[in-house]
Amino acid sequence: MRLAIDAMGGDHAPKEVVLGAMDAVKELDVEITLYGDENQISPHLTNNKNITIVHTEEVITSNDEPVRAVRRKKNASLVLMANAVKEKQADACISAGNTGALMSAGLFVVGRIPGIDRPALSPTLPTVDGKGFLMLDVGANVDAKPDHLLQYAIMGSIYSEKVRKIQQPRVGLLNVGTEDGKGNDLTKKAFELLQSAPINFVGNVEARDILNGVADVVVTDGFSGNVALKTIEGTAETIFSLLKGTLMSSTKTKLAAALVKKDLGGLKDKLDYSEYGGAGLFGLAAPVIKAHGSSNARAIYNAIKQAKHMVEFEVTPTITATVESIGKVEEE
């Protein structure tokens, strides 16, 4: 299996990207091509077995306007990576770089699955039982129509079943209440569509319950999803910051901290994004994974593993076939 990776994307690139790639080729049956500045990549590449470098000095930064950058910076590492997938030189691609640029490259270079109107950015987030849940969309498109939410639900359900190995994954619609008929025009119409869709729809779910594992897939528009995602991230960071401040406030609390250090470490691991890989851009013609901007080697490794599983378990072909079959039923 061939994977293309933007070696220059992310806060800790290229070092952590290279380290994650080396870990992956040691443990997974993959061949990796790193796109980026060879002079910066090579010092970290101590084992180049099954890893090749395509040199380019052009990079899309976080300050670049996404669409313009993808169209003008033809030799940027992120664009060359996406082109490799388009030209069938790679089966999937991964970047921890500019999210908007990756979405633009996904749309304009890799292309959409026929019948999918808009791709969805879809991370797996932690739950208290450690199983996690998939949420989509978290920002690929701030606006959505009921049909888009239906497509998100189908794609999320297929991914959860094939990659996360959840039989009959529970799909919930993010809303302001759990009762039928709650919400705005979008959620009311989407609710009706989801009820008749070939998925295990469990109804409306509230944001306060999603970390408790109320659903395996949570569907929402990109605006609400992004707000929910940032709230979860911010709340987790704040809790750990407050906890650290309290435990370090006196000799007594420092002694207590020493006693529960291992347990707190386990709690932090449970909430660690790096264990879940990256956010898939579902709806594209091939797997495209957005790794977190602050990804370390472990997060990159898990994003590579995630991309490998998406290819192995034929997530994209299954989405394509399902959307096509639904389209035929609607035509009849």
Curated annotation (Swiss-Prot):
Enzyme Commission code(s) on record: 2.3.1.274
Disulphide bond pairs: none
GO cellular-component term (any): cytoplasm
Lipid metabolism among keywords: yes
Pathway: Lipid metabolism; phospholipid metabolism
Cell compartment(s), UniProt: Cytoplasm
Main location as per UniProt: cytoplasm
Family recorded in the similarity comment: Belongs to the PlsX family.
Function: Catalyzes the reversible formation of acyl-phosphate (acyl-PO(4)) from acyl-[acyl-carrier-protein] (acyl-ACP). This enzyme utilizes acyl-ACP as fatty acyl donor, but not acyl-CoA.
Subunit composition and interactions: Homodimer. Probably interacts with PlsY.
Protein name (record): Phosphate acyltransferase
